[in-house]
Amino acid sequence: MKTGKIIKVSGPLVVAEGMDEANVYDVVKVGEKGLIGEIIEMRGDKASIQVYEETSGIGPGDPVITTGEPLSVELGPGLIESMFDGIQRPLDAFMKAANSAFLSKGVEVKSLNREKKWPFVPTAKVGDKVSAGDVIGTVQETAVVLHRIMVPFGVEGTIKEIKAGDFNVEEVIAVVETEKGDKNLTLMQKWPVRKGRPYARKLNPVEPMTTGQRVIDTFFPVAKGGAAAVPGPFGAGKTVVQHQVAKWGDTEIVVYVGCGERGNEMTDVLNEFPELKDPKTGESLMKRTVLIANTSNMPVAAREASIYTGITIAEYFRDMGYSVSIMADSTSRWAEALREMSGRLEEMPGDEGYPAYLGSRLADYYERAGKVVALGKDGREGAVTAIGAVSPPGGDISEPVTQSTLRIVKVFWGLDAQLAYKRHFPSINWLTSYSLYLEKMGEWMDAHVADDWSALRTEAMALLQEEANLEEIVRLVGMDALSEGDRLKLEVAKSIREDYLQQNAFHENDTYTSLNKQYKMLNLILSFKHEAEKALEAGVYLDKVLKLPVRDRIARSKYISEEEISKMDDILVELKSEMNKLISEGGVLNA
C-alpha cells in the first residue's frame, strides 16, 4: 500500500501527491478517518480523488493510502430486501455502527452480513469440471428468489471438495482444482462496478416487459432487455411511473436506485413495497427488491457510484437467469454530479456546463442493459431492463442529458405537465412518446394475447392523432361544423383517453391491468365505434347513440377486477343488442 499526501481539498475533490504507484479508478482511504475515495485522474505523481463521504475537516498534509483495488461490490446472498447507500454500505448496519440516523464519516461496514448463515444446497459434485458461470449450488434467499451460486469469472478446473449445510458468505463451500493450484469458493464474489459482467452472447429482445400500465403496454411497450427513458418536468409523475413499473413490472428482480432525489420517495418505497403483493407469486414485493438510496443530501460524488453499483447487482442476477429491471431516479442528478466533478477538475465544459464525455458515460450505463445467454453450461437466459428518469429543468427536453439519453434508448415515455395539471395520470403524452420495439412486441402480443391486438392498437392510435387534428377545427369553428362521423371519432377518442389511458395508481383494481383485460377494454371501446358507425349508416341520430346506457358500463369497465373479467364479454353482448335495437327503431331515414 502506497501512502501519499493531500495538497488540495475542493469539496468532494481531493488532490494528493506521491501517488505514482496508484492507478486510475483505484480505491483510496483519505485522511486520518480513512474516508473512501476513488482516483479519477492521474497527472505525474499527483492523483485527483473523488471522495464518497463528506470532506469537511480534511486538509493539506493529511495521508492518502491506496488499496490497489477498483471500487467493487460484494455479490452474494443478502442482497435482496436490503437497502444500501451509493457505495454498497447497508444503511441499517451503518446506523448501528455509527449510532446515528445520519451518515457519519469514516465508518466502515461490510456490504453483506457476515454473521448470517445461509442453507447451501450443492447441485454439482466432486469430480465435475466447472468454469466461469457454472452453477455449483443454490441458496433459498427469500420465498421467491432462489440464489444460484456461480463459479467466479477466471476460475476453471475440477471440483475437489463441495459441502452442503449452513454457511456465512465468507466460509468455504467448495474447492476447485485449477492449473494454478486449488481455489476456494465462497457464497460471495466481488466485482468492479465500472466493468460490465461478461456473458456468452447477446440476444435480440422479443418479449415485452409488461407493467400493468395500459398506456405503456398497449402503445409504448418496452422489451425485456430494453432501455427506456422517462423525461418530464417537476410534478409530472416520473417517480410514480417508476414506482408503478417497479411494483407491477413482469420481472423477477427489481433494483431501485434513488439517485439524488428526495429521501421521502425512498421512504415511500420502504413503506409500500412490503405491504404490496406480487400478482404472480402472492408474496411481498420487497422479497424481490434491492434498494440503493443516494438521496439529495448525501455526498454528491456517491451519486455516480450508485448508478454503477445498481447495474452491477442487476447484471449479477441476470447471470443467474433472472429477468431484472433497474430503475434509476434520476439520471439528471447523476449528470449534475458529473458536472460538479468536471468543474472542480477544471475540464473544458460542453453543452450547459456538462462534461464533453456525458454522452459516453450515459451510453456506458444503458448499454449494460440487454437480454443475454449467461456464461455456464446450462445456457441460462437473463435480461436487464433499464428505465431511467430524466428531470430536465423546466421540462425542456432539448437539454443535453435528455438528448444524450434519447440517442441511446429505444423507448421514450414523455411526461406532459399539461396532462398532469388536468389530473390525467400517467401523464405520458401519446402524441410525442414512442417505442422502437413496437413491431416486435406487436408480433408477440398477436401470438400470445389476441391475434388482432396490433390492429386494435393501430386503430386506437390513429383515432387519437385524428382527434388532435379535429380539435384545431373545433377551436376555430365549433363542434357543430363537424359531420356526425367526425363527432363520433371525437367521442371515441375521448373514451380512449379517459377510460383507457387514464389510470388510478391508488385504486386496487385499476392500479394493475393484465394484458387480457387491456385487450378486452380496448376491444369494447372500438367495438362501440364500429357498432355506432353501423347505426349512423342506418340513419340513427348520433345523440341517441351517445345516450346509450351501455356507455357508462364501458367507462367503468376499468374497475372490474381480474377475477370478474368475463363481465366484459357481457358488456359487449349488451352493446350489440342495444345498437341493434336502435337500428331496428330506425332514425332519420324513417322519419
UniProtKB/Swiss-Prot annotation:
GO CC terms, sorted: proton-transporting ATP synthase complex
Domain of life: Bacteria
Top-rank EC class of the record's enzyme: translocase
Binding site for ATP: G232, P233, F234, G235, A236, G237, K238, T239
Gene3D superfamilies associated with the record: 2.40.30.20, 2.40.50.100, Bovine Mitochondrial F1-atpase, Atp Synthase Beta Chain, Chain D, domain 3, P-loop containing nucleotide triphosphate hydrolases
Transmembrane parts of this sequence: none
Entry EC no(s): 7.1.2.2
Molecular function as annotated in GO: ATP binding; proton-transporting ATP synthase activity, rotational mechanism; proton-transporting ATPase activity, rotational mechanism
Reaction catalysed by this enzyme: ATP + H2O + 4 H(+)(in) = ADP + phosphate + 5 H(+)(out)
NCBIfam families tied to this protein: PRK04192.1
Function, in words: Produces ATP from ADP in the presence of a proton gradient across the membrane. The V-type alpha chain is a catalytic subunit.
Family per record: Belongs to the ATPase alpha/beta chains family.
HAMAP family: ATP_synth_A_arch
Protein name: V-type ATP synthase alpha chain
Source taxonomy: Bacteria, Bacillati, Bacillota, Clostridia, Eubacteriales
